[in-house]
UniProtKB/Swiss-Prot annotation:
It catalyses: GTP + H2O = GDP + phosphate + H(+). GO terms for cellular component: plasma membrane. The gene is lepA. It comes from Heliobacterium modesticaldum (strain ATCC 51547 / Ice1). One of its GO terms (biological process) is positive regulation of translation. This is Elongation factor 4.
C-alpha cells in the first residue's frame, strides 16, 4: 500500500434526524479549510432547497478534504454525508458500502433514537469502525454521561472515550478529526490490479451526460480509460475524472481507495445503475463487487398530470429523477377518471412526498396523486397467486380464496410517560404487541407487528402528535399474513370512479365508506341534477350521500293562478333534470382526490 493510500480515510456520519449531522459536516468542512468564510453557509451539503426547508438530508453527498494531523502528516478525508430518515435507509446503505468508518452522532439531550439503531446495525453489517460522538453538549438539557451509558447499553459500543462535541459552537471538532485519523483504517486495494469501481450515486448534467459518483476499490481510472459497466456490458471512454471539494474539481487519476466522480459521455440514464461495478474494458476484473441489495418499494401510488398533455413531460421528469433516486420505481398505467399516468413505487410516505415535491418544483409539473397502497398477495381459488399493487386490479370476489397483506415489525422508542398513548395507537391500527423494553429509566422501546397498510396512511403523524414529537419509529418488513380484506369502491351518479377505490379491512370498511361519502359530498360542486355518491363492497351499498341539484325557481312568473299550471312547470323541470342525469357527467375537483388521503385525520 502506497503512502498516499495509507493516508486516505473514508468515513460517513450516521445519526437520527435533527441530531446535528449536517451541522457537524459543516464544521468539519470549515475546520479543514475546504470552504472560505464567504462560501460557508448552514448545511452546505444539503444542496436541494427541499432539504433545507425540511431540515433533512435526502441525497447523499461526497466531499474530499485535506487535513494536517498533529503527527505532521497530511491526510485525505472523504466525507460521505448520508440521510437519517427511515425512508432513505437505501441511500444510507449505499454510502456505508463506500466507507471504512462512521461517526455515530447522538444528541446529548435526546439520546439514542430508533433510526440511529437501524443505521448502526447497517454499519456493523458492513464491518465499519464506529466512533461515537455526543453532540449538542452546550444545551442546558444535555446529559452526556447518560447518553454515553445508553450507547453502551443499547448498542454495545464502548463509549468511554466518546467525543463530546457541540457542532453549533465548534467545540470538539479537532478531536473528532484526530479520532478519524487514528481509529478508521485506511482503504485496502491495489492500484495496479484490474479496475473495480462501485457507483454509489449518479446525477444528470445537461452538457456532460450522466455523471457517476464512484468509490475506486481496486486499480486506477484516468481520462482516456475505456470503461465497461459490468451489469450491462456497455463500454464508454472516460472524458474526465475528479473529486468534490465540495465544488467539483478535475484530477489526473483516481486510484484504489479514493472517492470521486467519472464523466464518460453516458447519454442514457439507465446505463449508470447505482450499485453497479465499473471495470476496465481492456483488462476487466473477473467479477463485480458484491452489489447492493435490490431495493423493494413498500408503498405504491398513482401519479397523473392534471392536464392530459403533460404525460410526456412527466415521463421525462421521472426518467431524470430515477437517475438520482435509485429507489424510485414506476410503470405507465391508465385510469378511467384520470387518464394516462404512472404507478410509482416508493420506500415510504416521506419518500413519496419528496418525489412529488421534486417533480413539481424541479420540473414544474402539476400532479394528482391517488391514495397510497401496499402490495397485496391474493391466493385465488384456482391455486394461482397474484400480487396486486393497485386496488382496481383485484380479481373478482368469487375467484379469491384469501388475501394476504404485508406486515412490518415496528420498533418505537418513546419516553415512558407516553407508553399508554403509543400502545393505544398501535392497537387501533391492528397491531400485535410483541415486546416492551426499558432502555433507561425514562425511555422505553416498544415492539409491535403491524400491517404496513396502516402505517403508510398517517401512523407517523399520529405517533408524533400523541407523543408531543418525542417518539421515533423504525420498521422492517417481516412477510405476509392473511387478513379479512375487502375492496371499497365509490360510485358517482352510478359510475365507478376507479381512482377512489381502496382495499380496507372488513371491520373498517363501513366507517371508511361513510367518511368518504361525507367528505366527497362537501367537496364535489353541486350540479344541475342530483348526484348520488355510493360506497359499495361488491354489490352491496354500505353508505350513500346525495348532492342536491341546483334548481331554478320556475314558478317565479306565476302570480296566483291555478295549481295545475304550476304543477305542469314543475313536472317539466323534473323531466329535464331526469334527462340531464342520464347524459350528464360530473367534474371531480383535485381536492376530492386528496380527500381520500386525509380521511383518517
Amino acid at each position: 500500500m502506497g503512502k498516499a493510500q495509507a493516508n486516505i480515510r473514508n468515513f460517513c456520519i450516521i445519526a437520527h434526524i435533527d441530531h446535528g449531522k449536517s451541522t457537524l459536516a459543516d464544521r468539519i468542512l470549515e475546520f479543514t479549510g475546504a470552504l472560505t468564510e464567504r462560501e460557508m453557509e448552514d448545511q452546505v451539503l444539503d444542496s436541494m432547497d427541499l432539504e433545507r426547508e425540511r431540515g433533512i438530508t435526502i441525497k447523499l453527498q461526497a466531499v474530499r478534504l485535506q487535513y494536517k494531523a498533529k503527527d505532521g502528516q497530511v491526510y485525505t478525508l472523504n466525507l460521505i454525508d448520508t440521510p437519517g430518515h427511515v425512508d432513505f435507509t437505501y441511500e444510507v446503505s449505499r454510502s456505508l458500502a463506500a466507507c471504512e468508518g462512521a461517526l455515530l452522532v447522538v444528541d446529548a439531550a435526546q439520546g439514542i433514537e430508533a433510526q440511529t439503531l437501524a443505521n448502526v446495525y447497517l454499519a456493523l453489517e458492513n464491518d465499519l469502525e464506529i466512533i461515537p460522538v455526543v453532540n449538542k453538549i452546550d444545551l442546558p438539557s444535555a446529559e452526556p454521561d447518560r447518553v454515553k451509558q445508553e450507547i453502551e447499553d443499547v448498542i454495545g459500543l464502548d463509549a468511554s472515550d466518546a467525543i463530546l462535541v457541540s457542532a453549533k459552537a465548534g467545540i470538539g471538532i479537532e478531536e473528532t478529526l484526530e479520532a478519524i485519523v487514528a481509529k478508521i483504517p485506511p482503504p485496502e486495494g491495489d492500484p495496479t490490479a484490474p479496475l473495480q469501481c462501485m457507483i454509489f450515486d449518479s446525477f444528470y448534467d445537461a452538457y456532460k451526460g450522466a455523471i457517476s459518483y464512484v468509490r475506486v476499490v481496486e486499480g486506477t481510472v484516468k481520462k482516456g480509460t475505456k470503461i465497461k459497466m459490468m451489469s450491462t456490458g456497455k463500454t464508454f471512454e472516460v472524458t474526465e475524472v475528479g473529486v468534490f471539494t465540495p465544488a467539483p474539481r478535475q484530477v489526473e487519476k483516481l486510484s484504489s481507495g479514493e472517492v470521486g466522480f467519472i464523466v464518460a459521455s453516458i447519454k442514457n440514464v439507465k446505463d449508470t445503475r447505482v450499485g453497479d461495478t465499473i471495470t476496465d474494458a481492456d483488462h476487466p476484473a473477473k467479477e463485480p463487487l458484491p452489489g447492493y441489495r435490490q431495493v423493494t418499494p413498500m408503498v405504491y401510488c398513482g401519479l397523473y398530470p392534471v392536464e392530459g398533455a403533460g404525460y410526456e413531460d412527466l415521463r421525462d421528469a421521472l426518467d431524470k429523477l430515477r437517475l438520482n433516486d435509485a429507489a424510485l420505481i414506476y410503470e405507465p398505467e391508465t385510469s378511467v377518471a384520470l387518464g394516462f399516468g404512472f404507478r410509482c413505487g416508493f420506500l415510504g410516505l416521506l419518500h413519496m412526498e419528496i418525489v412529488q415535491e421534486r417533480l413539481e418544483r424541479e420540473f414544474d409539473l402539476d400532479l394528482i396523486t391517488t391514495a397510497p397502497n401496499v402490495i397485496y398477495k391474493v391466493n385465488q381459488t384456482d391455486g394461482q397467486v397474484v400480487f396486486v399493487d393497485n386496488p382496481t386490479k383485484l380479481p373478482p370476489n368469487q375467484k379469491i380464496e384469501t388475501i394476504e397483506e404485508p406486515y412490518v415489525k415496528a420498533s418505537v422508542m418513546v419516553p415512558s410517560d407516553f407508553v399508554g398513548a403509543v400502545m393505544e395507537l398501535c392497537q387501533e391500527k391492528r397491531g400485535v404487541f410483541i415486546n416492551m423494553d426499558y432502555i433507561a429509566a425514562q425511555r422505553v422501546m416498544l415492539i409491535y407487528e403491524l400491517p404496513l397498510a396502516e402505517i403508510i396512511f398517517d401512523f407517523f403523524d399520529q405517533l408524533k402528535s400523541r407523543t408531543k414529537g418525542y417518539a421515533s419509529l423504525d420498521y422492517e418488513l417481516i412477510g405476509y399474513r392473511v387478513s379479512e380484506l375487502v375492496k371499497l369502491d365509490i360510485l358517482l351518479n352510478g359510475d365507478l370512479i376507479d381512482a377512489f377505490s381502496i382495499i380496507v379491512h372488513r371491520d373498517r370498511a363501513y366507517n371508511r365508506g361513510r367518511a368518504l361519502a361525507d367528505k366527497l359530498k362537501d367537496l364535489i360542486p353541486r350540479q344541475m341534477f342530483e348526484v348520488p355518491i355510493q360506497a359499495v363492497i361488491g354489490n352491496k351499498v354500505i353508505a350513500r350521500e346525495t348532492i342536491k341539484a341546483i334548481r331554478k325557481n320556475v314558478l317565479a312568473k306565476c302570480y296566483g293562478g291555478d295549481i295545475s299550471r304550476k304543477r305542469k312547470l314543475l313536472e317539466k323541470q323534473k323531466e329535464g333534470k331526469k334527462r340531464m342525469k342520464q347524459v350528464g357527467s360530473v367534474e371531480i375537483p383535485q381536492e376530492a382526490f386528496m380527500a381520500v388521503l386525509s380521511i383518517d385525520k
